[in-house]
């Protein structure tokens, strides 16, 4: 996409820096004026208010999670600001509508990973609603997260058998009524991993009982990922050099008797990985680190793992977090513009499921922002700042609608070459092939990517 040079500057038209040809050059967060960033955030949210109420189950869960994390960052930075307070009040009523939307669906017709998105969003909704004093709706969202979303994944997606080869257990991304078993992909498993950790922490913080089953499932999901990571011959972790890795879209093992040979729904290609998985896996591992002592105590109490070593456990978690952070820094950020990119695979950008994978860059930034300035020992300030600037400077100047594309053709191709040089894999640079996507869905998802970027940016100020 050619960069648009606007002829008129307004107070909301720049990140307090002059316009440049390549907005990725804006990387110094210290040069930003917080009040200008706040105005941009308010403008971005007002557009989100106009486009968020579309009809697509999983996208609604994810985009509203972006909104809640963004709003939480706004509140922490400017708790007494009248415009921020107005945003928070608007979200109160939006959460009423979102709850009605969720309850209008037959849970048996939804895919397993849908419940992961809604479950995580519901935990953040509880936090927001308790802060605003709506305890009744907060409790409804808690039940939605635990008694419906988590329970659906446990009962209909988790594989309790010991027979799967080469790694048992894990979650299938099938539909909840069992008509389609689906594949054990990364997104379904990491969502259940992260959701189990967060439910356990929520219940523990609020001193509620009956929380051990969530701790147990978090540990089981850890074992599934750790087992795959140790089977280096199957390449579930894409090695980038210098102890940097990225996790693939799904683990595969092509041998007679393998339960991980499925290459459909969506169509798999060699080396394929997705930005969203990287952010969620770093977040899940970080959550696991926060409850490591509880896990160790539970294992000892229940004799659950005779080979468990707490020091090895902790070191392994830290190692994976650091390696993933290095992988993101090396493989998913353009060297020429510092902008966060989607991995260059047709499986991400193509017409089959591009409308789903479109949100990945935002999801990655959402968790980057939550993990702090040095996630895994890597400082992501420059890339978050550059990406937020790029998103802002390629918006529709009239509506403040963000675009699926916020990088130039030239830098896209340079990034694709950068990625192929690192991995020997990937496709040539391409645009998002989402022409068939419902327009309001597209607007809502693209706006949520911007909210994710600005939420992460606020945390850098």
Regions found by a protein language model. Name each.
Residues 5-23:
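N-terminal export signals
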Residues 109-122, 142, 148:
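Mobile, glycine-rich extracellular loop/lid and propeptide segments
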Residues 196, 211-288, 325:
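Active-site cradle of extracellular carbohydrate-active enzymes
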Residues 132-133, 199-212, 288-299:
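Inter-helical turn/loop segments and adjacent helix faces that build the functional surface
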Residues 23-113, 117, 137, 155-168, ...:
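CBM-like carbohydrate-recognition segments
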Residues 142-143, 148-228:
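Aromatic- and glycine-enriched pocket-lining scaffold segments that form the walls
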Residues 67-70, 121-125, 196-199, 285-288, ...:
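The core hydrophobic/aromatic register in alpha-helical repeat solenoids, strongest
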